[in-house]
Amino acid sequence: MGQEDLMNRAEDVADQFLRVTKQYLPHLARLCLISTFLEDGIRMWFQWNEQRDYIEATWSCGYFLATCFVLLNLIGQLGGCVLILSRNFVQYACFGLFGIIALQTVAYSILWDLKFLMRNLALGGGLLLLLAESRSEGKSMFAGVPSMGESSPKQYMQLGGRVLLVLMFMTLLHFDFNFFSILQNLVGTALIILVAIGFKTKLAALTLVLWLLVINVYFNAFWTIPAYKPMHDFLKYDFFQTTSVIGGLLLVVALGPGGVSMDEKKKEW
């Protein structure tokens, strides 16, 4: 009984947090989610020559095609971010960013690096949640029109987004055999499974947001490394990728798990 009371109290705290932040949370979630694209687009501008030379050397595609690749990445990412933040053509912006993820996965040989591939897929999961949000906004414009219930594509987008966010967590698992690492893995795994199946979703996602935030600031503090060191760019990449997944989890908190979830099924029972 005491454990149930504790869980109920935690859910009350989460609900109170949502009531206070409901006007700002979706905006913060979108900003966090697109942060990795924003940072990468800006980096393309400041490292134009280095990025072009890398693509030209790796793929032997010539100066012109390498320049087109960098330009496409720059315009595609920054343009997509502007559209998402301004709430214009969000679905087209999401599809464009999906294309950028696919393009970079091939161009930078991420396909063969399981850790980076999983992070890119998790990023895609965040975009799926953003697509689901844009669909719900579109429906709200026709609130007075009778409908057949919540659209199935939106429900499955939310499910797919939640499941793909699990992949990001899996890259953070530590396989050190000490008490803290084992405890961290067990608690984190339990929370991410709850998010994936949609049980106690908002509380689990909010707890994961706080946990990832602490890990991100502690382990990926790129600002403490001089900019000329390779580790600076590596940590910066990790920092913004994790921030994007935090944005995806915040969208889960703001929107709920959707129709394909245990939380929704419980209401029917």
UniProtKB/Swiss-Prot annotation:
**What GO cellular-component annotations does this UniProt entry give?**
endoplasmic reticulum membrane; endoplasmic reticulum-Golgi intermediate compartment membrane; Golgi membrane
Pfam families (alphabetical): SURF4 (PF02077)
> This protein's superkingdom?
Eukaryota
Gene Ontology terms for molecular function: cargo receptor activity
Q: Which UniProt keywords apply?
A: Endoplasmic reticulum, Golgi apparatus, Membrane, Protein transport, Transmembrane, Transmembrane helix, Transport
Q: Which residue ranges does the UniProt annotation give for the motif Di-lysine motif?
A: 266-269
This protein's membrane topology, according to the annotation, is: Multi-pass membrane protein
The family assignment reads: Belongs to the SURF4 family.
How are the domains described in the entry? The di-lysine motif confers endoplasmic reticulum localization for type I membrane proteins.
Name of the protein described by the UniProt record: Surfeit locus protein 4
Origin species: Takifugu rubripes
**Higher taxonomy:** Eukaryota, Metazoa, Chordata, Craniata, Vertebrata
Query: By which gene is this protein encoded?
Result: surf4
